[in-house]
Amino acid sequence: MDKRNFIKTLGALSFSPIISASEFSKNHSLSNNLPKIDNVDELWKTVRSHYTLKDDYINLESGYYNIIPEPVLDHFIKHVKHVNVEGSYYMRNDLNKNKQRVTKELAKLVGSTPDQIAITRNATESLDLVISGFPWQKGDEAIYAKQDYGTMKEMFEQISDRYGVINKIISVPNHPKSDEEIVSLYESQITKKTKLIMVCHMINITGQILPIKKICEMAHSHGVEVMVDGAHCVGMFDFSIDDLNCDYYGSSLHKWLATPLGAGLLYVNKNKTHKIWPLLANGITDKTDIRRLNHIGTHPVHTDLAISNSIDYLNWIGIKRKEERMRFLQRYWSDKLRNTNNVVVNTPEDINRSCGIGNVGLTNMSPSEMAKTLMDKYKIFTVAIDYANVKGCRISPNIFTTTDELDRFVDAVKKMAT
Protein backbone atom coordinates (compact mmCIF):
# COMPACT_ATOMS: atom_id res chain seq x y z
CA MET A 1 0.00 0.00 0.00
CA ASP A 2 1.49 3.34 -1.02
CA LYS A 3 1.70 6.35 1.30
CA ARG A 4 -1.14 8.33 -0.30
CA ASN A 5 -3.64 5.46 -0.20
CA PHE A 6 -2.52 4.49 3.31
CA ILE A 7 -3.25 7.97 4.67
CA LYS A 8 -6.48 8.15 2.66
CA THR A 9 -7.65 4.92 4.26
CA LEU A 10 -6.96 6.33 7.71
CA GLY A 11 -8.86 9.48 6.79
CA ALA A 12 -11.99 7.48 6.02
CA LEU A 13 -12.77 6.97 9.71
CA SER A 14 -16.20 8.27 10.70
CA PHE A 15 -16.58 11.48 12.66
CA SER A 16 -19.59 12.93 14.46
CA PRO A 17 -19.80 16.03 16.65
CA ILE A 18 -20.95 14.34 19.87
CA ILE A 19 -20.07 10.72 20.57
CA SER A 20 -19.45 8.73 23.71
CA ALA A 21 -15.97 8.16 25.08
CA SER A 22 -16.12 4.49 24.04
CA GLU A 23 -17.19 5.37 20.49
CA PHE A 24 -14.51 8.04 20.39
CA SER A 25 -11.89 5.46 21.34
CA LYS A 26 -13.08 3.00 18.69
CA ASN A 27 -13.28 5.55 15.89
CA HIS A 28 -9.91 7.10 16.65
CA SER A 29 -7.85 3.93 16.96
CA LEU A 30 -5.07 2.96 14.58
CA SER A 31 -5.30 -0.70 15.56
CA ASN A 32 -7.45 -1.83 12.64
CA ASN A 33 -5.95 0.45 9.99
CA LEU A 34 -2.27 -0.46 9.94
CA PRO A 35 -1.20 -3.06 7.37
CA LYS A 36 0.18 -6.40 8.50
CA ILE A 37 3.79 -6.68 7.28
CA ASP A 38 5.92 -9.71 8.09
CA ASN A 39 8.94 -8.93 5.91
CA VAL A 40 11.34 -6.82 7.98
CA ASP A 41 12.87 -4.92 5.05
CA GLU A 42 9.43 -4.10 3.72
CA LEU A 43 8.38 -2.94 7.19
CA TRP A 44 11.14 -0.35 7.46
CA LYS A 45 10.46 0.90 3.93
CA THR A 46 6.81 1.31 4.87
CA VAL A 47 7.75 3.04 8.12
CA ARG A 48 9.94 5.55 6.27
CA SER A 49 7.03 6.31 3.94
CA HIS A 50 5.03 7.37 6.99
CA TYR A 51 7.36 10.33 7.63
CA THR A 52 7.56 13.62 5.78
CA LEU A 53 11.28 14.45 5.90
CA LYS A 54 13.28 17.40 4.66
CA ASP A 55 15.45 16.46 1.71
CA ASP A 56 18.10 19.17 2.19
CA TYR A 57 19.81 17.42 5.14
CA ILE A 58 20.00 14.09 6.96
CA ASN A 59 18.41 14.25 10.40
CA LEU A 60 20.51 12.40 12.99
CA GLU A 61 19.09 14.39 15.92
CA SER A 62 15.86 12.62 16.86
CA GLY A 63 16.74 12.78 20.55
CA TYR A 64 15.26 16.21 21.24
CA TYR A 65 11.93 15.69 19.52
CA ASN A 66 10.78 12.67 17.55
CA ILE A 67 8.98 13.55 14.32
CA ILE A 68 5.41 12.20 14.38
CA PRO A 69 4.63 9.50 11.78
CA GLU A 70 1.81 10.61 9.50
CA PRO A 71 -0.72 7.95 10.59
CA VAL A 72 -0.43 9.31 14.15
CA LEU A 73 -0.29 12.93 12.99
CA ASP A 74 -3.47 12.38 10.98
CA HIS A 75 -5.27 11.18 14.10
CA PHE A 76 -3.84 13.98 16.21
CA ILE A 77 -5.37 16.49 13.80
CA LYS A 78 -8.69 14.63 14.09
CA HIS A 79 -8.48 14.94 17.87
CA VAL A 80 -7.86 18.69 17.61
CA LYS A 81 -10.90 19.08 15.36
CA HIS A 82 -13.06 16.82 17.49
CA VAL A 83 -12.31 18.66 20.73
CA ASN A 84 -12.75 21.98 18.95
CA VAL A 85 -16.24 20.97 17.77
CA GLU A 86 -17.36 19.72 21.17
CA GLY A 87 -15.67 22.44 23.20
CA SER A 88 -16.81 22.53 26.82
CA TYR A 89 -19.05 19.51 26.29
CA TYR A 90 -15.98 17.36 25.74
CA MET A 91 -14.09 18.93 28.63
CA ARG A 92 -16.93 18.34 31.08
CA ASN A 93 -18.11 14.93 29.90
CA ASP A 94 -15.34 12.95 28.21
CA LEU A 95 -12.00 14.46 29.22
CA ASN A 96 -11.51 12.47 32.42
CA LYS A 97 -12.85 9.21 30.98
CA ASN A 98 -10.50 9.38 28.01
CA LYS A 99 -7.56 10.38 30.18
CA GLN A 100 -8.16 7.35 32.39
CA ARG A 101 -8.37 5.14 29.30
CA VAL A 102 -5.09 6.49 27.89
CA THR A 103 -3.41 6.19 31.29
CA LYS A 104 -4.42 2.53 31.42
CA GLU A 105 -2.93 1.93 27.96
CA LEU A 106 0.26 3.75 28.92
CA ALA A 107 0.60 1.77 32.14
CA LYS A 108 0.33 -1.47 30.18
CA LEU A 109 3.00 -0.29 27.74
CA VAL A 110 5.55 0.45 30.48
CA GLY A 111 4.77 -2.59 32.61
CA SER A 112 3.01 -0.94 35.52
CA THR A 113 -0.50 -0.19 36.81
CA PRO A 114 -2.72 2.88 36.25
CA ASP A 115 -2.69 3.80 39.94
CA GLN A 116 1.07 4.42 39.65
CA ILE A 117 1.08 6.34 36.34
CA ALA A 118 0.26 9.97 35.58
CA ILE A 119 0.34 11.76 32.24
CA THR A 120 2.47 14.91 32.36
CA ARG A 121 3.89 17.28 29.76
CA ASN A 122 7.50 16.03 29.71
CA ALA A 123 10.22 14.34 31.74
CA THR A 124 11.35 17.65 33.22
CA GLU A 125 7.93 18.25 34.73
CA SER A 126 7.70 14.66 36.00
CA LEU A 127 11.08 14.60 37.70
CA ASP A 128 11.10 18.19 38.93
CA LEU A 129 7.72 17.51 40.50
CA VAL A 130 9.29 14.73 42.57
CA ILE A 131 12.40 16.74 43.45
CA SER A 132 10.44 19.83 44.49
CA GLY A 133 7.68 17.83 46.21
CA PHE A 134 9.95 15.52 48.21
CA PRO A 135 9.72 16.09 52.01
CA TRP A 136 13.22 17.51 52.41
CA GLN A 137 14.74 18.51 55.73
CA LYS A 138 17.81 20.66 56.26
CA GLY A 139 20.95 18.54 56.04
CA ASP A 140 19.39 15.82 53.89
CA GLU A 141 21.59 14.58 51.05
CA ALA A 142 20.88 13.80 47.40
CA ILE A 143 23.11 12.10 44.83
CA TYR A 144 23.19 12.63 41.09
CA ALA A 145 25.71 12.62 38.22
CA LYS A 146 27.43 15.30 36.16
CA GLN A 147 25.99 13.58 33.11
CA ASP A 148 22.38 14.04 34.25
CA TYR A 149 20.05 16.42 32.43
CA GLY A 150 20.51 20.10 33.22
CA THR A 151 17.02 21.10 34.35
CA MET A 152 16.87 18.37 36.98
CA LYS A 153 20.31 19.32 38.28
CA GLU A 154 19.11 22.91 38.46
CA MET A 155 16.09 21.82 40.50
CA PHE A 156 18.40 20.04 42.95
CA GLU A 157 20.40 23.26 43.21
CA GLN A 158 17.19 25.13 43.96
CA ILE A 159 16.13 22.77 46.75
CA SER A 160 19.65 23.06 48.12
CA ASP A 161 19.24 26.84 48.31
CA ARG A 162 15.69 26.55 49.63
CA TYR A 163 15.91 23.71 52.15
CA GLY A 164 19.61 23.29 52.88
CA VAL A 165 19.88 19.96 51.08
CA ILE A 166 23.43 18.79 50.32
CA ASN A 167 23.99 17.60 46.75
CA LYS A 168 26.71 15.03 46.13
CA ILE A 169 27.74 14.78 42.49
CA ILE A 170 29.47 11.82 40.83
CA SER A 171 30.79 11.32 37.30
CA VAL A 172 29.74 8.22 35.36
CA PRO A 173 32.53 6.76 33.16
CA ASN A 174 31.78 6.54 29.45
CA HIS A 175 33.13 2.99 29.29
CA PRO A 176 32.43 1.15 32.58
CA LYS A 177 34.04 -2.23 33.06
CA SER A 178 31.00 -3.74 34.80
CA ASP A 179 27.62 -3.03 36.39
CA GLU A 180 29.30 -3.27 39.76
CA GLU A 181 31.58 -0.35 38.92
CA ILE A 182 28.54 1.87 38.37
CA VAL A 183 26.66 0.59 41.42
CA SER A 184 29.70 1.09 43.65
CA LEU A 185 30.13 4.63 42.35
CA TYR A 186 26.69 5.63 43.61
CA GLU A 187 27.02 3.58 46.79
CA SER A 188 30.30 5.32 47.69
CA GLN A 189 28.44 8.60 48.23
CA ILE A 190 25.68 7.25 50.48
CA THR A 191 25.61 8.30 54.12
CA LYS A 192 22.99 8.10 56.85
CA LYS A 193 21.67 11.44 55.59
CA THR A 194 21.12 10.34 51.99
CA LYS A 195 17.44 10.43 51.02
CA LEU A 196 17.28 10.31 47.23
CA ILE A 197 19.41 9.24 44.26
CA MET A 198 18.67 10.47 40.76
CA VAL A 199 20.00 8.20 38.03
CA CYS A 200 19.57 8.11 34.25
CA HIS A 201 18.12 4.97 32.72
CA MET A 202 19.83 6.12 29.53
CA ILE A 203 22.33 8.99 29.69
CA ASN A 204 21.02 11.43 27.11
CA ILE A 205 24.41 12.72 25.92
CA THR A 206 26.05 9.32 25.27
CA GLY A 207 23.22 6.79 25.09
CA GLN A 208 24.73 4.65 27.87
CA ILE A 209 22.15 2.46 29.63
CA LEU A 210 22.75 2.11 33.37
CA PRO A 211 21.97 -0.95 35.55
CA ILE A 212 18.90 0.56 37.19
CA LYS A 213 17.59 -2.55 38.92
CA LYS A 214 20.95 -3.20 40.60
CA ILE A 215 21.27 0.44 41.65
CA CYS A 216 17.78 0.33 43.16
CA GLU A 217 18.52 -2.87 45.08
CA MET A 218 21.70 -1.34 46.47
CA ALA A 219 20.05 1.97 47.39
CA HIS A 220 17.06 0.32 49.05
CA SER A 221 19.40 -1.78 51.18
CA HIS A 222 20.58 1.54 52.63
CA GLY A 223 17.05 2.93 52.97
CA VAL A 224 17.56 5.37 50.07
CA GLU A 225 14.95 6.06 47.40
CA VAL A 226 15.72 6.17 43.67
CA MET A 227 14.30 8.49 41.01
CA VAL A 228 15.00 7.42 37.42
CA ASP A 229 15.30 9.75 34.44
CA GLY A 230 13.97 7.68 31.57
CA ALA A 231 13.42 10.53 29.13
CA HIS A 232 14.75 8.51 26.19
CA CYS A 233 13.56 5.04 27.12
CA VAL A 234 9.80 4.74 26.73
CA GLY A 235 9.24 3.72 23.12
CA MET A 236 12.89 2.98 22.34
CA PHE A 237 13.42 -0.35 24.07
CA ASP A 238 11.49 -2.98 25.98
CA PHE A 239 11.42 -2.77 29.77
CA SER A 240 9.04 -2.83 32.73
CA ILE A 241 9.06 -0.01 35.26
CA ASP A 242 7.72 -2.32 37.96
CA ASP A 243 10.58 -4.73 37.27
CA LEU A 244 13.14 -1.95 37.77
CA ASN A 245 11.92 -1.60 41.37
CA CYS A 246 12.52 2.15 41.42
CA ASP A 247 10.51 4.62 43.48
CA TYR A 248 9.97 7.28 40.82
CA TYR A 249 10.32 7.35 37.03
CA GLY A 250 9.88 10.13 34.49
CA SER A 251 9.89 10.10 30.69
CA SER A 252 9.12 12.31 27.69
CA LEU A 253 6.69 10.62 25.33
CA HIS A 254 7.31 13.06 22.47
CA LYS A 255 10.76 11.53 22.13
CA TRP A 256 10.77 7.82 21.27
CA LEU A 257 7.05 7.09 21.58
CA ALA A 258 6.67 9.86 18.97
CA THR A 259 3.61 11.56 20.43
CA PRO A 260 2.89 15.23 19.71
CA LEU A 261 4.97 17.72 21.69
CA GLY A 262 4.03 18.12 25.33
CA ALA A 263 3.43 14.56 26.56
CA GLY A 264 5.25 12.91 29.43
CA LEU A 265 4.95 10.15 31.98
CA LEU A 266 5.35 10.09 35.74
CA TYR A 267 5.56 6.86 37.72
CA VAL A 268 5.34 6.95 41.49
CA ASN A 269 5.43 3.72 43.47
CA LYS A 270 2.02 3.47 45.13
CA ASN A 271 3.66 3.26 48.55
CA LYS A 272 5.37 6.62 47.99
CA THR A 273 2.58 8.71 46.44
CA HIS A 274 1.38 10.09 49.77
CA LYS A 275 4.71 11.73 50.60
CA ILE A 276 5.12 13.85 47.44
CA TRP A 277 3.67 17.36 47.40
CA PRO A 278 1.92 18.31 44.12
CA LEU A 279 3.38 21.01 41.90
CA LEU A 280 -0.04 22.71 41.85
CA ALA A 281 -2.65 22.36 44.58
CA ASN A 282 -5.92 20.60 43.74
CA GLY A 283 -9.06 19.26 45.37
CA ILE A 284 -8.04 15.60 45.65
CA THR A 285 -7.75 14.89 49.37
CA ASP A 286 -6.68 11.24 49.09
CA LYS A 287 -2.89 11.46 49.30
CA THR A 288 -2.53 7.99 47.80
CA ASP A 289 -4.24 9.07 44.55
CA ILE A 290 -1.57 9.78 41.94
CA ARG A 291 -3.96 12.04 40.03
CA ARG A 292 -3.35 14.78 42.57
CA LEU A 293 0.25 15.01 41.31
CA ASN A 294 -0.50 15.91 37.68
CA HIS A 295 -3.03 18.70 38.10
CA ILE A 296 -1.91 21.47 35.72
CA GLY A 297 -5.19 23.18 34.86
CA THR A 298 -6.55 23.40 31.33
CA HIS A 299 -4.09 22.10 28.75
CA PRO A 300 -4.10 20.70 25.16
CA VAL A 301 -6.09 17.51 25.80
CA HIS A 302 -5.81 16.36 22.18
CA THR A 303 -2.13 15.70 22.82
CA ASP A 304 -3.09 13.26 25.57
CA LEU A 305 -5.53 11.54 23.19
CA ALA A 306 -2.82 11.04 20.57
CA ILE A 307 -0.76 9.04 23.08
CA SER A 308 -3.15 6.17 22.40
CA ASN A 309 -2.47 6.37 18.65
CA SER A 310 1.29 6.45 19.24
CA ILE A 311 0.98 3.31 21.34
CA ASP A 312 -1.00 1.66 18.53
CA TYR A 313 1.73 2.58 16.07
CA LEU A 314 4.47 1.23 18.32
CA ASN A 315 2.54 -1.99 18.90
CA TRP A 316 2.13 -2.37 15.14
CA ILE A 317 5.91 -2.29 14.76
CA GLY A 318 6.53 -4.22 17.97
CA ILE A 319 8.68 -2.81 20.77
CA LYS A 320 11.22 -5.66 20.58
CA ARG A 321 11.52 -5.21 16.83
CA LYS A 322 11.95 -1.46 17.24
CA GLU A 323 14.59 -1.99 19.93
CA GLU A 324 16.50 -4.32 17.61
CA ARG A 325 16.31 -1.77 14.79
CA MET A 326 17.44 1.13 16.96
CA ARG A 327 20.38 -0.84 18.33
CA PHE A 328 21.29 -2.02 14.83
CA LEU A 329 21.36 1.56 13.51
CA GLN A 330 23.57 2.78 16.34
CA ARG A 331 25.98 -0.14 16.06
CA TYR A 332 26.02 0.20 12.26
CA TRP A 333 27.81 3.55 12.42
CA SER A 334 29.63 3.25 15.76
CA ASP A 335 31.28 -0.09 14.95
CA LYS A 336 32.59 1.38 11.69
CA LEU A 337 34.19 4.31 13.55
CA ARG A 338 35.57 2.76 16.76
CA ASN A 339 39.03 1.95 15.44
CA THR A 340 39.46 5.03 13.27
CA ASN A 341 42.37 7.38 13.96
CA ASN A 342 41.37 10.64 15.71
CA VAL A 343 37.84 9.30 16.31
CA VAL A 344 36.52 8.75 19.85
CA VAL A 345 33.24 6.88 20.34
CA ASN A 346 31.85 7.94 23.72
CA THR A 347 29.25 5.16 23.90
CA PRO A 348 30.05 1.77 25.51
CA GLU A 349 31.01 -1.03 23.12
CA ASP A 350 29.12 -3.61 25.18
CA ILE A 351 25.93 -4.17 23.19
CA ASN A 352 23.80 -4.33 26.35
CA ARG A 353 24.90 -0.87 27.52
CA SER A 354 23.29 1.15 24.72
CA CYS A 355 20.49 1.13 22.18
CA GLY A 356 19.69 3.79 19.57
CA ILE A 357 21.66 6.82 20.79
CA GLY A 358 25.42 7.20 20.54
CA ASN A 359 28.09 9.88 20.73
CA VAL A 360 31.25 10.36 18.69
CA GLY A 361 33.99 12.98 18.84
CA LEU A 362 37.18 13.95 17.04
CA THR A 363 40.55 14.59 18.68
CA ASN A 364 41.39 17.17 16.01
CA MET A 365 38.15 19.16 16.21
CA SER A 366 35.91 20.63 18.93
CA PRO A 367 32.34 19.30 19.22
CA SER A 368 30.83 22.60 18.07
CA GLU A 369 33.14 22.73 15.03
CA MET A 370 32.37 19.10 14.29
CA ALA A 371 28.59 19.66 14.37
CA LYS A 372 28.92 22.78 12.22
CA THR A 373 31.10 21.02 9.65
CA LEU A 374 28.75 18.05 9.47
CA MET A 375 25.83 20.37 8.76
CA ASP A 376 27.49 22.99 6.55
CA LYS A 377 29.69 20.71 4.45
CA TYR A 378 27.97 17.33 4.57
CA LYS A 379 24.33 18.32 5.27
CA ILE A 380 24.04 16.09 8.32
CA PHE A 381 22.24 17.48 11.38
CA THR A 382 23.54 16.50 14.83
CA VAL A 383 24.05 18.25 18.18
CA ALA A 384 27.36 19.12 19.86
CA ILE A 385 28.02 17.90 23.41
CA ASP A 386 30.94 19.41 25.33
CA TYR A 387 30.58 18.87 29.07
CA ALA A 388 30.72 16.21 31.80
CA ASN A 389 33.71 14.42 30.26
CA VAL A 390 31.87 14.02 26.96
CA LYS A 391 33.27 15.72 23.88
CA GLY A 392 31.53 14.90 20.64
CA CYS A 393 28.26 14.95 18.74
CA ARG A 394 25.21 13.03 19.87
CA ILE A 395 23.99 10.81 17.07
CA SER A 396 20.37 9.74 17.36
CA PRO A 397 19.02 8.15 14.18
CA ASN A 398 15.41 7.03 13.97
CA ILE A 399 13.45 4.11 12.60
CA PHE A 400 13.11 6.06 9.36
CA THR A 401 16.92 6.36 9.00
CA THR A 402 18.52 4.30 6.23
CA THR A 403 21.91 2.61 6.19
CA ASP A 404 22.77 4.68 3.11
CA GLU A 405 22.37 7.82 5.23
CA LEU A 406 24.56 6.34 7.95
CA ASP A 407 27.19 5.43 5.35
CA ARG A 408 27.29 9.09 4.34
CA PHE A 409 27.73 10.04 8.00
CA VAL A 410 30.55 7.53 8.55
CA ASP A 411 32.30 8.69 5.39
CA ALA A 412 32.02 12.32 6.51
CA VAL A 413 33.48 11.63 9.97
CA LYS A 414 36.40 9.69 8.50
CA LYS A 415 37.20 12.55 6.14
CA MET A 416 36.99 15.07 9.00
CA ALA A 417 39.32 12.91 11.11
CA THR A 418 42.20 13.10 8.61
Residue ranges and their predicted role:
Residues D2-T418:
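Pyridoxal 5′-phosphate
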